[in-house]
Amino acid sequence: MFSLLVFGLMLHFLKTYIPPYSVNEARMLRDSWFVNICGANIALFPFFFYSKNRKVKDYMFYIGVLSGLIALFYPQEPLAKENQMGEQLDIVRFYYHHWMVLAVPLLMVLLGHHKLSYKRILSAPTGLLLLMLFIMLNQIFQSELGFIPLRDREEFFDIGYKNTSYIWGPGTDDAIGNFLALFTPSFFKTIPVGEFAGQEKYWPWFWMIVPVYTLVTPLSFLVSMIFDHKAFAADVKKLAAKLCGKTPAVK
């Protein structure tokens, strides 16, 4: 399992030698960093794999399984390829990476390397938001070090500018992003002070807090029930017995 993760990390950098990255320097400089959820997980999963922190392992499982399934069932990147024939290797790379972030955490649980607990499901949304801060930091360093150009005044309101993981807003005509935005409080959608006060602009990262906790938490709970339903049922019985003033029978 660890070797799959290491190979995935190597492949992330080796992709710079194949189209479209090898023929587009600007994209190569941008995408060789970890600027989306999958890329950031590719960078961190090899280190998380040997972590003794159970919340970190739970994060690996929930976000790996959920993000992997979404990417495989709705592969936005391959569908958007303008040159399908010329970029076949990158399409294969895309599917390997997203299969990997799904398969390795799943194998960890199935093979007994890690035991899930429904009580730790908040590690999924919390970990995802921390991951987005990691992505945001990557993008800031990219801009400050010259890997991507700094935004000019006209691009200040462009949600789609270098926005690969919804950090800066829901995107333009993006079904998933627009769905997430439905759960965002209105004050996270406008500029509070300054020259552009009152105009619509999503607060970077903050706009995602409510949608992530609202959506990822119940999804993680449903997934946890596949593996930890017995512990949940036992805890429900204990709680019911306590509320009724009875002591549950010990088997």
Task: Locate predicted features.
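Short, highly charged, low-complexity non-transmembrane loops/tails of multi-pass membrane proteins
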Residues: 230-251
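A cytosolic-side transmembrane-helix exit/cap motif
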Residues: 24, 78-88, 142-147
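Alpha-helical transmembrane segments in multipass membrane proteins, preferentially the mid-helix core
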Residues: 42-48, 100-119
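Membrane-interface transmembrane-helix boundary segments in multi-pass integral membrane proteins
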Residues: 119-130, 144-221
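Membrane-interface helix-boundary motifs at transmembrane edges
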Residues: 1, 50-58, 111-122
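Aromatic-anchored segments of alpha-helical transmembrane domains
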Residues: 6-17, 64-76, 128-139
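Membrane-embedded alpha-helical segments of multi-pass membrane proteins
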Residues: 31-44, 60, 73, 92-103
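Short juxtamembrane and helix-loop transition motifs at transmembrane-helix boundaries
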Residues: 1, 14-28, 82-85
